[in-house]
Amino acid sequence: NYIPELYRRGVKNFVVTNVPKGYASDYPGANFLKVVNTLEALQRLAERHRDEFNIPIVGITGSNGKTMVKEWLYQLLSPSMFVTRSPRSYNSQIGVPLSVWLMNEQTQVGVFEAGISMPGEMLALRDIIQPTIAVLTNLGAAHQENFSSMEEKCREKLILFHDAETVIYDGDDEVISKVIAEYPDY
């Protein structure tokens, strides 16, 4: 149970699946929002937050190199504009919404990683990031055990590209080129 420690540290708002017994007396001034699924609640909240920004957003996916590309873009862009980026390697189902939540009124461009380890994960990340620019770094063996083929993994990663205005990928990679050819809009 993480609530007592967080409350001691000053956190007063909690999203929970079960409201703790005695919450009014044990946690005066705290608010508890009860939801069916805390992960989905976090993701939907981040999605709504992202909707508030009409700025360039770079979404980066790939088997390797996401963090390096993100940090390189940050170093390139940050001298001339305020960039919000994923901290460290926050590219998971929890890390992406926490990263997007960091955007504020100063943010001029967002740069976020999106990592997946199984089919069905990229849709939620795409809806949160909503990239205007999408980058596929490479396609490798990482997390391959949950996919039936490299093509299946590539298709899952390309979900991030759905509404992007600009798509960047390695056109020399045979698998990526083959799967990209299935999507004439790219």
Regions found by a protein language model. Name each.
Residues 39-185:
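Phosphate-binding loop of NTP-binding sites
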Residues 11-18, 167-170, 186:
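Short, hydrophobic beta-strand segments that form beta-sheet elements in well-ordered domains
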Residues 1-44:
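N-terminal leader/targeting and accessory segments in enzymes
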